[in-house]
């Protein structure tokens, strides 16, 4: 009988591509991971991993086993959910990994809702920017991920996860108060073609989305300054260093000086926010209320955004 715990370790090794990284994700030592993988190979009678440079990759046998492992682990998630429901599991902790703006916009309101609706459900929050939240869910470090997908940089579907769409939000133009277009009620993206731009660093999907929107508008933005921190981007715009596109929710509650924020016309720049859980866990009696509360908070946000 194959030990499911070893299948989780195999999946982590395949995802992270090094034993050291897999061990860190699972809070194990590299030697413990190596021992468990060796035991799994002995159980199956096949070599499952092979060295590839400084990392590891699955063999053909490993690929076959991983496909079945994903299905098996999803079924175990369903079994745990049904057992928890049978036992009347109405109290417990759910760990949610989320990006900062998502915490402020939907997770914090969801926690308030849960405090009234399901006081037995305790939410533990982990700040996870960029792509970090989804691997945390897959590795079992978190139960729910709150993540984003940008236009121009769609995420590949992962059958191990169930995604729950929450809301889409536009990016607004941030201009210095003295910019020639500052008095306009809205700004055509093409009209910013001659401005200096402030944007994220290469590799940030937000930058890919900005570049695509500008390309569709008919120009390549002249990127002069780079920061992945929206507060820094807005501060630079306030200093007259350039213009930027910033998610609307990131601007809410932010202290802005010497800048104006305007809706953009032309090719749309937007991002989609979604929750994700391990397949089979979506109806767990502790996780389902969290997803429902996130959905309620997002519906209110969509109303405000119009």
Where are the regions that the model predicts?
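A late-sequence structural motif
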Residues: 106, 259-304
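Hydrophobic hinge/microswitch elements
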Residues: 102, 129-142, 148, 201-260
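Flexible hinge/capping segments at coil-to-helix
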Residues: 157-171, 175-197
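Secondary-structure junction motif
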Residues: 148, 181, 185, 195-217, ...
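Beta-alpha-beta core module
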Residues: 155-165, 169, 231-280
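Central regulatory/effector-binding core of bacterial HTH transcription factors
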Residues: 91-154
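A short LG(V/I)-centered, amphipathic sequence patch enriched
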Residues: 19, 41-58, 63
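Short helix-boundary/capping micro-motifs
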Residues: 11-29, 34
